[in-house]
Regions:
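Cytosolic, membrane-interface loops and tails of multi-pass inner-membrane proteins
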Residues: 1-5, 58, 65-68, 173
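Hydrophobic side chains within alpha-helical segments
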Residues: 15-19, 57, 78, 108
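Membrane-interface elements of multi-pass transporters and channels
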Residues: 30-34, 62, 170
C-alpha cells in the first residue's frame, strides 16, 4: 500500500538508529562496560551523537555502495566489548576511535551491496555471522577458534574497505 505522506526510508533510519546505535550504548552503559558515573554517560553519548550525524548525511552511501565514514556498527562494537570482556578504558578507546572514524572519509564495505569481491564477502560474512552466533552462546568464555574466525573477518572487512577507498581515490585523482 502506497501512502504518499509516509516516508518508509525515514522510519527505516529511525529503527536502524535505535537498533544499531542506541540499544548497544544502553547495553554497554547499563552493564558497566563503560565504567561508572558521568564519564560513562558521556562515553555512551559520544557514539550516539556521531551516529546521529552519520544517519543525517545525504552522502552516507557512495555510488559504489560503500558507507562513507564509519557506519553505525555500534552493535558490533558492543558485541566485541562484551565477548572480549574489555575493561572500561579499552572499551572507551574502541568507542572513541570508531566515533572519530565516522568523520573520516573512508568507504566501508556494505556487505550485501558492494560489488567488488561480493561473492567472497558474502561467504565470509555468512561465516562471520555463524561465529557471532556461536560466540554469543559461549559468553563469558569464548572459544579461541570461533573468536579467531570472527576477528579475521573484521580484519578482512577493514582491509577491503581501505583497498576500495584507495582505489576510488586513485580513480578520481
Amino acid at each position: 500500500v502506497h501512502v504518499p505522506w509516509f516516508d518508509g526510508a525515514l522510519l527505516d533510519n529511525i529503527v536502524d538508529y535505535i537498533t544499531y546505535a542506541f540499544m548497544p550504548m544502553v547495553l554497554l552503559w547499563s552493564a558497566g562496560y563503560l565504567g561508572e558515573g558521568r564519564s560513562a554517560t558521556v562515553l555512551a553519548v559520544i557514539p550516539l551523537v556521531a551516529s546521529a550525524y552519520q544517519f543525517c548525511r545525504v552522502d552516507a552511501k557512495t555510488e559504489d555502495h560503500l558507507f562513507l565514514g564509519f557506519p553505525s556498527y555500534w552493535n558490533i562494537a558492543a558485541f566485541y566489548v562484551v565477548v572480549l570482556d574489555l575493561a572500561p578504558t579499552a572499551a572507551a578507546i574502541v568507542l572513541l576511535v570508531c566515533a572519530v572514524l565516522v568523520f573520516v572519509p573512508i568507504g566501508y564495505v556494505y556487505p550485501s551491496r558492494t560489488v567488488r569481491l561480493q561473492g567472497l564477502t558474502l561467504a565470509l560474512t555468512t561465516l562471520w555471522l555463524a561465529s557471532y552466533a556461536v560466540l554469543l552462546t559461549q559468553v563469558p568464555d569464548p572459544g579461541p577458534v570461533w573468536l579467531a574466525i570472527s576477528l579475521a573477518y573484521v580484519v578482512y572487512y577493514v582491509v577491503l574497505s581501505l583497498y576500495l577507498t584507495a582505489r576510488r581515490l586513485r580513480a578520481t585523482a
